[in-house]
């Protein structure tokens, strides 16, 4: 008896036999995934409006390269017109390859500016030896970029923080500051003058790393502090990596939970009126007992014992 082998479906997409073709297909699939996630974040949070001038903060790292690449691709088919300008802050770090970004951006035909500000000397002078420079460096960098945005008609400032950054920041705030807070995908700066967006808010860092490697971006390492990482953030990062390895999908669930907050199931009295619960009839709030009276009563009870 002869076996009858099933014929392949005529519309099926045959798997490429050439490893290079397979790699190209995987890269194409990854690029489409990132485009979809970035587009979803832009839509969900209203990140881009018609006529926006978006300053893409380009550090030379994998995240900011990927963000610029995604925005350029989406710009060609976006439902609203907007312009991009790539801005890099030259902090005058020793041996910084100042030619890399201009050459890359010139080849792309992307409008760009290099803002020169010697924050390296300031940070090196102020921060004690052996201490992390990240916090001060970040504040100085943010101030310089905000100043550029103010004087160049920028309407949105795009930063390259991704999903893992947002989740890590949530745990940093939880563990070290006793508050439930992360990085908002879209926010107004503390001075009220700027709107900041994070188009990579839905994108995993591992996917960004794979995409950056596939695209062969000319990565510039941060040598200001030897690429040192804040120890606390490093510990949180290891925790998230362990979870991803042991319980795949857990970090994704945490990221999704940040968009599903139930104030009535927490304990923040500024977000939910707990005093109104159980109030009889239409009794006005001023008839409710003064919360301080309960403390007084408690103290009196202890004094009588």
Swiss-Prot record:
GO BP, sorted A to Z: tRNA thio-modification
Subcellular compartments: Cytoplasm
Catalytic activity entry: cytidine(32) in tRNA + S-sulfanyl-L-cysteinyl-[cysteine desulfurase] + AH2 + ATP = 2-thiocytidine(32) in tRNA + L-cysteinyl-[cysteine desulfurase] + A + AMP + diphosphate + H(+)
InterPro entries in alphabetical order: Rossmann-like_a/b/a_fold, TilS/TtcA_N, tRNA_Cyd_32_2_STrfase, tRNA_thiolation_TtcA_Ctu1
EC number: 2.8.1.-
GO cellular component: cytoplasm
UniProt pathway: tRNA modification
Motif (PP-loop motif) on chain: 59-64
Domain of life: Bacteria
Alphabetized UniProt keyword annotations: 4Fe-4S, ATP-binding, Cytoplasm, Iron, Iron-sulfur, Magnesium, Metal-binding, Nucleotide-binding, RNA-binding, Transferase, tRNA processing, tRNA-binding
Gene3D superfamilies (alphabetical): HUPs (3.40.50.620)
GO MF annotation, one: ATP binding
Cofactor: record remark: Binds 1 [4Fe-4S] cluster per subunit. The cluster is chelated by three Cys residues, the fourth Fe has a free coordination site that may bind a sulfur atom transferred from the persulfide of IscS.
Protein name: tRNA-cytidine(32) 2-sulfurtransferase
Organism for this UniProt entry: Xanthomonas oryzae pv. oryzae (strain KACC10331 / KXO85)
Taxonomic classification: Bacteria, Pseudomonadati, Pseudomonadota, Gammaproteobacteria, Lysobacterales
Gene giving rise to this polypeptide: ttcA
């Amino acid at each position: 008896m002869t076996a009858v082998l099933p014929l392949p479906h005529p519309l099926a997409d045959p798997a490429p036999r050439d490893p290079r073709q397979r790699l190209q297909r995987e890269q194409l699939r990854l690029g489409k995934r990132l485009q979809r996630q970035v587009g979803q974040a832009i839509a969900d949070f209203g990140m881009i409006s018609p006529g926006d001038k978006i300053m893409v903060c380009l550090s030379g790292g994998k995240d900011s390269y990927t963000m610029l690449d995604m925005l350029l691709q989406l710009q060609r088919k976006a439902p609203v017109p907007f312009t991009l300008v790539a801005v890099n802050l030259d902090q005058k770090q020793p041996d910084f390859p100042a030619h890399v970004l201009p050459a890359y951006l010139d080849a792309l035909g992307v409008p760009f500016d290099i803002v020169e500000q010697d924050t390296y000397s300031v940070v090196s002078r102020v921060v004690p030896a052996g201490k992390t420079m990240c916090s001060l460096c970040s504040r100085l960098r943010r101030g310089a970029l905000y100043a550029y945005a103010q004087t160049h008609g920028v309407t949105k400032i795009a930063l390259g923080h991704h999903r893992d950054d947002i989740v890590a920041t949530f745990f940093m705030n939880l563990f070290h500051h006793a508050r439930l807070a992360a990085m908002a995908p879209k926010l107004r700066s503390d001075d009220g003058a700027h709107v900041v967006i994070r188009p990579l808010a839905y994108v995993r860092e591992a996917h960004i790393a794979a995409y950056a490697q596939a695209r062969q971006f000319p990565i510039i390492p941060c040598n200001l502090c030897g690429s040192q990482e804040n120890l606390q953030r490093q510990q949180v990062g290891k925790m998230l990596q362990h979870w991803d390895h042991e319980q795949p999908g857990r970090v994704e669930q945490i990221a999704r939970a940040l968009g599903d907050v139930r104030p009535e199931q927490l304990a923040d009295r500024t977000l939910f009126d707990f005093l109104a619960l159980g109030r009889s009839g239409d009794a006005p709030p001023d008839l409710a007992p003064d919360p301080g009276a309960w403390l007084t009563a408690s103290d009196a009870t202890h004094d009588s014992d």
